[in-house]
Each structure stands twice: as structure tokens, then as C-alpha cells.
Swiss-Prot record:
One of its GO terms (cellular component) is cytoplasm. It is found in: Cytoplasm. This is Ribosomal RNA large subunit methyltransferase K/L. Residues 43-154 form the THUMP domain. It comes from Haemophilus influenzae (strain PittEE).
Length: 711
């Protein structure tokens, strides 16, 4: 009996133990990352040929403790390698693990290689060559602290390489992972299996090979034992011939009941080719189809729906996936009553969009991603969610977040008509109207931006996430916007300058119209879009006040107020902001509106420091500072409540005799220190109600705005 070790992906060890035991393995023992077992020659070859879950099968040669690279070299060079293979073979060393002495796997692999070739030279033999591409012999070294295990890799290439997959779509599953998903899905051999988003077909091919009794390595041409001196050719031929006979025997017994659907006809061609290579093309029916129109191909039977849908690593990039999972859940409940469903995803949040309760779930890794597989039982009663294809859109809306959907629909009717009259492309459609749906929905021309407000700490995180998913689904249905034109953002309470935090780097800009001004927006790269919609009337008012005046825009952001002032006939404009990014944005806004000339200055500076040194006067000043800032580029922190009087003192110095300051901020509960202002010789009138547009009338505290002049 040989002592062997089968490696597998983390989480599949128990499943692998069962599989190996069924194949005849003795004394199977689970450890992290694999299973130790004993086997005679026939069982060894049977596990190599038939295991669908093992990544590699290793034959340990050296097990020892090492405390330096010299110990490593000594252990390897002192081993009798001629008993395993001769000098004419090529070899390669896979080295895994590090410790304090051997800190790099490449260094460890080099020392093992040195030990092997030096051993052969000491025996008077030719140095065996290293082959990184297709070596005759593969040596596997594993180091954990001081514990070293060096094994002969009897697999050769990793066992997930079945040989049938010539090509794949994006993010393909490893075949070993696909086999595990099938085994855990609840699918019963002989029953229908449907993959509605099949990609290159790996799940269906693995399942079909299980039913057809096709050994997963039946088509493998090269093995790690081909040049092994202990290789038992007669035992190997017996095991392989048994597998060939069994596969031929089963071919005539199986009727086609595997179905693969995908929207991409190109990837379906790859799936068909892969199935042909895997010997199961006659068992699987392929069809180009959208999951939104998914039909049950076996209405009078009960089977399993299995799939690995697309998934994103960040929720904020996946509105299209939210819609996909939502409609998938609806089709399952309409078309597959009484069926089992098994879905594998890295984002359990997306699985919540199915709106189904899982009966079982399993954790797994897909490369670096933590994933989950959830099994469901579809109710035997046909869902009323979709009763007629013509009513698909309406019923989707009414099933998912109906209260939110109805409110959004009502707001759209009211606000869209008003926005058209005002010649506005960008406006708010929903602003946390319903407490349970704590988010904002904005339209920017053909795009929709959904901004989630951070949920209070007393709200269950999973419940808040589910409501967000439902709201996104309903928004897509009500607005009819294309999924790639819905942008989802998670917004938290502003801390310092996190409105400047970069979220992406797409660089996708387009302009919107606002009272005759054209303004660039970017919906994806930053927390904000480049245009504060609640200040629309403030900007319009500035345009009306600016004619013939010298205008200062302090804390200017993207300079949209400057554009309105210039279009309103300002004699000059000065735009100051600390961010070079936003100042460049402001410049592009000016160019877009044909605003040019030396009278329009753009200044990158700490606004407070610049103001203290400014020696000219302005007739109209717009200042919209952050609520709080502790930017490293500022010498001191800023708090609008604490510091606004000092700001007004400096602004008074640069304000012309008949000039006006328009001062705004977003601090809720802000209290203007009117007494201190009067002592400065300034008077302030609150005009917040006049600057609140129709689409923000429910949120009266979104900003406060003041008009300040000399007494």
C-alpha cells in the first residue's frame, strides 16, 4: 500500500474524502487542503483517473524538518533519486510555502533543483534538464514552518485540466470546482439539468460526464507517472481499459436531458466544442436565450436548475447584475415549480435578489474570491409574479418594492414635466421619501444615479441591503433605463474631504443643460458627480445678479456657479479651489460655454489662505465651504459652525461697498452668528427657502443659504 496525498480547493476536503473512499482508498484522513490516504497500485491509478475533485495526487518521498537552506539542500541531495527516475528525464520543481530562512518560493525551488542535479552528478550521471513547460517528472515541495514534504506529483499537469476545454468565456470555473458544485447541487443522476447562463458549459459537461460514467481524465495523454520507475503499467492499463469499456457501455443508455442557455452565441459555440471534446455533445442541448425569457424545457418533469451567474466584486458596480438576478428569480418561480435550484456566486447580496429562501448553503473559493453556493426548492405553486409576457414590466414593478415603485412613478410624472418646462437635464426624482428606502434617485439626461444613504446603526445590515437591491430593481423597471446607464453609489456622512475621494477611473464625462448653461458631469469616478443639484436655483440667482460685476467663487468645486455668473454678464470671474482636478473641470466647463479671456481667472490654492492674502475687491461673492475639513493640504482644520465668523471677517475686507455675499453650507442645524456679523458691520438675510427647487422641496435642510451685505 502506498501513502498518498490528494490536494483540493479549501472547503472540498470532506467531499474529496467520500469520493476517494468510493474509489477504494483506505485510511482516508482529511487535513486542510487535502486528504491523506492509502492505496494499492490499481486504486492509485483509479483515483488519478476518476477523481473529479482532486487538484493533484502526490506520492511523498521526503518528510523532514529543516532550519536553513543548507538543511533543505542536504535533505534533497541525500535522497536516492535514481530509485524514482533516471537522468534522461526532464523535471520541474513546484515549491510552496516559506519560513524565516527560506523567504521566497523561487529560492526554495532552486535549492531543491540544485540538490537533485547534484545528486545525479555525484552518481556519475548526466545532469537532468529542467523543463518548465511539459516536464517528464514534476517534483512538489511543501514547507510549513520547519516541516518539509517533498513529493512526486503523479498527476503531472493539475487534474482540473480535463483536456476538453479548448476555450472559455470570461471568468470560467475550474473543472474541479464545477464538479463540486454539481455534487452539492442536489441534482440526481437521470433527472433534467438546466443551466440558464451556461457560458462555456463546464457545469453541464461535468454533470453529463458523471452520468455517462466518463472518467474525467480519460482523454489525458501525459501523466506524472510516465517516467516513474515504480509505475505499474499492467495495473494502469487494466484501470484505463475498465474506464473505456464503462464509458462505451453507458453511451447508448442515456437520453439527452441536459440544457444549456446563454445570451452570447459565441460562447455557446465554445461550449458545443468543449462538449464534443468531452464526449458528451449528444447529451446536451444548447440554445441562445435571454434569462429574462427563460422557459422550462421539461415541463412535465422535476429536475435541477444550476448556474454560476456573472457577479461583481463591488456592489456599486453591479446594477445590471441586480436586475439580472431579480428577473432570474422571477423566471424560476414561474417556469420551474417544484424544481431544485443551485446558484454559485461570490456575492451573497446578489443571491438575495432571487427573493428565495435557501435550504442549504456551502462556502467555497473560486480563485481568490470567497464564494457561496445556495440551494433552493421552488414552490410547487406557480408564481403569480408574471402572468403574461405583455405584463412583464408592470408585474415586476408591483412585486418588488411596490411602495417605492409607486412613489417613484408618482414623482416622475410630477417632476419630469416641470424639468422639461425649466429646460433641465439633471434633477432629483426621489429623496428618501419613504423611511424604509433611504436613498436618492437622480436623473442626468439618459442616466439614473441611485445613491444609498448609510443606514442608521440600529437598522439590520442585511435588511438595508435587501431594500437597496429591491429599490434598484424597481428603479430599473419604473424608469425603463438601460442597466448600463444606472449608476449605484453608497453614500455615507461626509467626513473631511471625502467628497473628493476617487472611486473609479473611467473618465466618462458628458454635459447636461441647466438654465442655458452646459455643465460637465462624471457619474462614476467620484462620490459626487460634479454638480450639486440642490444649488440649481442658487446658481441661477448668481447669474441674475452678476451682470457687470466682479465675481468671486470660493470653494468653487467644478465652477458651475462661475459659468452662470459669466453667462449672466459678469465683468470678471475668479474661481478658487484647492483641488487641481476640480479646477481643471471648472476650466472645461468654461470652455464648453465659450467663456474665454484673461478676465476669467482660475486659481488653485487653499481658499482660506488665499483669501487672507487677497488684495482686490469683488462685487459678488459665492462661498459654499465644506461642513468640515482636515485636509493635509490645509494648515488648519475647518468647521463651518466654528469658523464662519472668521470667514466673514475676511470676506468683508474684499467685498465692495455695495457688494453681496451669497453664503451657503450643508450643515444641518447651522446657526448664523448674527450678533458677531453685526459687530463686523455685516447684515445677513436667510434665503434658503428661495433657493430650494421643486425636486428638493421635501428636504428643507439639505442646505442653508444667506445673502450678506455691508450694513
Amino acid at each position: 500500500m502506498k501513502q498518498l496525498f490528494a490536494t483540493t480547493s479549501r472547503g472540498f476536503e470532506e467531499l474529496l474524502k467520500v469520493e476517494l473512499t468510493e474509489l477504494g482508498a483506505q485510511e482516508a484522513k482529511v487535513v486542510q487542503g487535502g486528504v491523506h490516504y492509502q492505496a494499492d497500485d490499481e486504486t492509485l491509478y483509479r483515483t488519478l483517473l476518476w477523481s473529479r475533485l482532486a487538484s493533484r495526487i502526490l506520492f511523498p518521498l521526503i518528510e523532514t524538518k529543516i532550519y536553513s537552506d543548507l538543511d533543505l539542500y542536504a535533505a534533497v541531495s541525500g535522497f536516492n533519486w535514481l530509485a524514482q527516475f533516471d537522468e534522461r528525464v526532464t523535471f520541474f520543481v513546484d515549491f510552496n510555502g516559506t519560513n524565516q530562512e527560506i523567504r521566497h518560493t523561487q529560492f526554495g525551488a532552486m535549492r531543491v533543483k540544485d540538490g537533485i542535479v547534484d545528486y545525479f552528478e555525484r552518481q556519475g550521471k548526466t545532469r537532468p534538464d529542467v523543463d518548465k513547460i511539459q516536464p517528464d517528472v514534476r517534483i512538489h515541495a511543501y514547507l510549513n514552518r520547519e516541516n518539509l514534504v517533498i513529493s512526486l506529483d503523479l498527476s503531472g499537469e493539475a487534474l482540473h485540466l480535463r483536456g476538453y476545454r479548448e476555450d472559455a468565456g470570461q471568468a470560467p470555473l475550474r473543472e474541479t470546482l464545477a464538479a463540486a458544485i454539481v455534487m452539492r447541487s442536489g441534482w440526481q443522476v437521470g433527472s433534467p439539468l438546466v443551466d440558464p447562463m451556461c457560458g462555456s458549459g463546464t457545469l453541464l459537461i461535468e454533470a453529463a460526464q458523471i452520468e455517462a460514467k466518463i472518467a474525467p481524465q480519460l482523454y489525458r495523454l501525459h501523466w506524472g507517472f510516465d517516467f516513474w520507475k515504480a509505475h505499474n503499467q499492467s495495473a494502469w492499463e487494466k484501470v484505463k481499459n475498465e474506464a473505456i469499456e464503462l464509458a462505451e457501455e453507458k453511451q447508448s443508455e442515456i437520453q439527452p436531458h441536459f440544457y444549456g442557455f446563454d445570451l452570447d452565441h459565441r460562447v455557446l459555440k465554445k461550449a458545443q466544442k468543449n462538449a464534443q471534446n468531452g464526449g458528451v455533445s449528444h447529451l446536451i442541448k444548447w440554445q441562445q436565450a435571454d434569462v429574462a425569457a427563460l422557459k422550462n424545457p421539461r415541463l412535465n418533469e422535476v429536475g435541477t436548475v444550476i448556474c454560476n451567474p456573472p457577479y461583481g466584486e463591488r456592489l456599486g458596480t453591479t446594477p445590471a447584475l441586480i436586475a439580472l438576478y431579480s428577473v432570474f428569480g422571477q423566471r424560476l418561480k414561474k417556469e420551474f415549480c417544484g424544481w431544485n435550484v443551485s446558484v454559485f456566486s461570490s456575492e451573497s447580496t446578489l443571491l438575495d435578489c432571487l427573493r428565495m429562501r435557501a435550504s442549504r448553503q456551502f462556502k467555497a473559493k473560486n480563485g481568490p474570491l470567497d464564494c457561496v453556493q445556495k440551494n433552493y426548492q421552488v414552490s410547487e405553486r406557480k408564481s403569480d409574479a408574471i402572468t403574461d409576457e405583455k405584463e412583464l414590466e408592470f408585474n415586476r414593478t408591483s412585486e418588488v418594492a411596490p411602495d417605492f415603485a409607486n412613489r417613484l412613478q408618482k414623482n416622475i410624472k410630477k417632476i419630469s414635466k416641470w424639468a422639461k418646462q425649466q429646460e433641465l437635464d439633471a434633477y432629483r426624482l426621489y429623496d428618501a421619501d419613504l423611511p424604509e428606502y433611504n436613498l436618492a434617485v437622480d436623473r442626468y439626461a439618459d442616466y439614473i444615479v441611485v445613491q444609498e444613504y448609510a443606514a442608521p446603526k440600529n437598522i439590520d445590515e442585511n435588511k438595508a441591503r435587501q431594500r437597496l437591491l429591491d429599490a434598484v430593481t424597481a428603479t430599473l423597471q419604473v424608469t425603463g433605463v438601460e442597466t448600463n446607464k444606472l449608476i449605484l453609489k453608497v453614500r455615507q456622512k461626509q467626513k473631511g474631504t471625502n467628497q473628493y475621494e476617487k472611486l473609479a477611473n473611467k473618465g466618462e464625462y458628458f454635459y447636461v443643460n441647466e438654465y442655458g448653461a452646459q455643465l460637465w458631469v462624471n457619474l462614476t469616478d467620484y462620490l459626487d458627480t460634479g454638480l450639486f443639484l440642490d444649488h440649481r436655483l442658487t446658481r441661477k440667482m448668481i447669474g441674475e445678479l452678476a451682470k457687470g460685476k466682479d465675481f468671486l467663487n470660493l470653494f468653487a468645486y467644478t465652477g458651475s456657479a462661475t459659468v452662470h455668473a459669466a453667462l449672466g454678464g459678469a465683468k470678471s470671474t475668479t474661481t478658487v479651489d484647492m483641488s487641481n482636478t476640480y479646477l481643471n473641470w471648472a476650466e472645461q466647463n468654461l470652455i464648453l460655454n465659450d467663456i474665454e479671456g484673461k478676465q476669467h481667472k482660475l486659481i488653485q490654492a487653499d481658499c482660506l489662505q488665499w483669501l487672507e492674502k487677497c488684495d482686490r475687491q469683488f462685487d459678488l461673492i459665492f462661498v459654499d465651504p465644506p461642513t468640515f475639513s482636515n485636509s493635509k493640504r490645509m494648515e488648519e482644520s475647518w468647521d463651518v459652525q466654528r469658523d464662519h465668523v472668521k470667514l466673514m471677517s475676511n470676506l468683508k475686507r474684499v467685498l465692495s461697498n455695495n457688494g453681496t455675499i451669497v453664503f451657503s453650507n450643508n450643515k444641518r442645524g447651522f446657526k448664523m452668528n448674527l450678533v458677531a456679523l453685526e459687530e463686523l458691520g455685516l447684515s445677513a438675510i436667510e434665503i434658503s427657502h428661495k433657493t430650494l427647487p421643486l425636486d428638493f422641496e421635501r428636504n428643507k435642510q439639505i442646505h442653508n443659504c444667506w445673502m450678506i451685505q455691508h450694513i
